[in-house]
Amino acid sequence: MANIRKTHPLLKIINGAFIDLPAPSNISVWWNSGSLLGLCLITQILTGLFLAMHYTADISTAFSSIAHICRDVNYGWLIRNIHANGASFFFICLYLHVARGMYYGSYLYKETWNIGVVLLLLTMMTAFVGYVLPWGQMSFWGATVITNLLSAFPYIGDTLVQWIWGGFSVDNATLTRFFAFHFLLPFVIAGASMIHLLFLHQTGSNNPTGLNSDADKVPFHPYFSYKDLLGFILMLIGLTAIALFSPNLLGDPDNFTPANPLVTPPHIKPEWYFLFAYAILRSIPNKLGGVLALLFSILVLMLVPILHTSKQRGNTFRPLSQILFWTLVADMLVLTWIGGQPVEHPFVLIGQVASTIYFALFLIALPLTGWLENKILNWN
């Protein structure tokens, strides 16, 4: 009799995805970030669910409900700290995952890649609406500034902003709908992640060489199930360490002050994981131009497969493209730093240069280098 995991309609899907899945034998630790993202999502949904049991989405009580969670709810402080810092780990894993895809040419699985970009946008949206919920100063002013950007769209802009606010300013209606979105979107992300996996399993995983690995596959379990488990343990150690020892390290002190529409904080800035995009937004003096640059800073990822010119898949054997890749990484770090600085000389100029380099690398330098490497190797 055949094994139940191979015959049962539900179990055979799980079996095909996590047990008997043929995986390349040489995928490195860079291939762990995908499963870590799954772990992050589960952690965030669970901690978020328990927080939602005690949170009230009303401007008069939101801030104090979080104080209540941290003071009076059993382990509420821990649940909140894990949820707040879990978001940071989520984005660390996301950026590593995208970087791996870019370095090794995994973006040539176009459906998987494009759904991945959609997942990135959904996660950014979820994190943004989530940051508004504590109703601190940075929550309120962040919501005001970022939603206000939509008013840059010609003709419909102002109507659009008021429609999102549910009134003429960021108020109770805004907080209530943001809570609704923040509760709903993670489940949309979970659904999209399943589609992401479905498309990935149509082709199988890429590997560090970028060559076809059909001749050398191993079963996912036990090899990569244990490798993933090691990643899980290491990440959870990191997450618990930061949640227990310095939970406010990555937060903004302004958010410990309840929202006050009459007092603007000296520096309005988002959480660290959005600073690179915020720097690109601020580097353009025109409002609509800034908004479009902000959108395109993420959507440019969708152009990466189209702009792939090399005859080789990954950057493993391409030293010139490697230099450009690490230049892009350095450039993103510079943008992240600039995003947290005040709008004054020399930061404005550095931000504009870094933003120009960011788009030039994606749209000009990487495609040209791929073409050049083909020429050098006489691969016409």
From Swiss-Prot:
Entry GO CC: mitochondrial inner membrane; respiratory chain complex III
Please give the start and end residues of each transmembrane region.
33-53, 77-98, 113-133, 178-198, 226-246, 288-308, 320-340, 347-367
Recorded hits in Pfam families, A to Z, give: Cytochrom_B_C, Cytochrome_B
Residues annotated as binding heme b b566: 97, 196
Keyword list (alphabetical) reads:
Electron transport, Heme, Iron, Membrane, Metal-binding, Mitochondrion, Mitochondrion inner membrane, Respiratory chain, Transmembrane, Transmembrane helix, Transport, Ubiquinone
Q: Gene3D superfamilies from the entry?
A: Cytochrome Bc1 Complex, Chain C
- Binding locations of a ubiquinone: 201
The main location class comes to mitochondrion
In its miscellaneous comment, the UniProt entry states: Heme 1 (or BL or b562) is low-potential and absorbs at about 562 nm, and heme 2 (or BH or b566) is high-potential and absorbs at about 566 nm.
Entry protein name: Cytochrome b
- Species of provenance: Polyodon spathula
**What is the gene called?**
mt-cyb
